[in-house]
Amino acid sequence: DHTLKLGGGVRQHRYQAGDAVLKLNDARDPLPAAERQPIAALLVALAGLRAPRELQDPDGNAITLVPAGHEGINGVAVRLQVADVAQSSQFYQQVLACTEVSPGVLRCGKALLLLEQASARCAPDTAPLAAKGLRYLTLQVFDCDAAYASALAAGAEGAKAPINMGSTARIAFIRDPDGIWIELSERASVT
């Protein structure tokens, strides 16, 4: 739909996907490989599709196309590998006001978070934001500063304090118990 320059040789291509926005960051310089990928897959519901289709993007990221309504997915869903499903579920409910649909399945706005048990912590604390792979989730908020402060007060790890991205947005990052990056975005065109 459109492209934003993020600085440092990074451009972000944004595509509308129903009620969600898929953001693809393109870096001028090579990015390091992430040690692990706690964001295991992106699932996208498509009307008229009869059966799930598992695909990979050019970087090897798992993208699964599913029929609309498959496992409750009517837009997008993200499969997260977590060390403790109950702990992660509690985090997303308490910190980000997600609602539990069923054990390990959370509604976040109109999207779903699918929590899978992993054998160990999936993202080391030092995992960089700028690396290859599915790197972060973005939640649109009305007040970035208030959302960031609320998340910290509820127990989230602060990863990057709120900053302005020109006149486009004000963003901040927190991390979940498994080190997954979560962007809190107060986008001028949305708020």
Residue ranges and their predicted role:
Residues 28-29, 67-69, 117-120, 187:
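Acetyl-CoA-dependent GNAT
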Residues 157-163:
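Short, basic/aromatic recognition patches
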Residues 11-22, 27-56, 74-84, 125-152, ...:
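Vicinal oxygen chelate
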Residues 37-44, 64-90, 95, 99-102, ...:
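N-terminal beta-strand motif that seeds the catalytic metal site of vicinal oxygen chelate
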Residues 94-95, 150-155:
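Short amphipathic alpha-helices in soluble, non-transmembrane regions
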Residues 1-22, 79-118:
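Core segments of cupin and vicinal oxygen chelate
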Residues 52-70, 182:
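Short, structured interface segments
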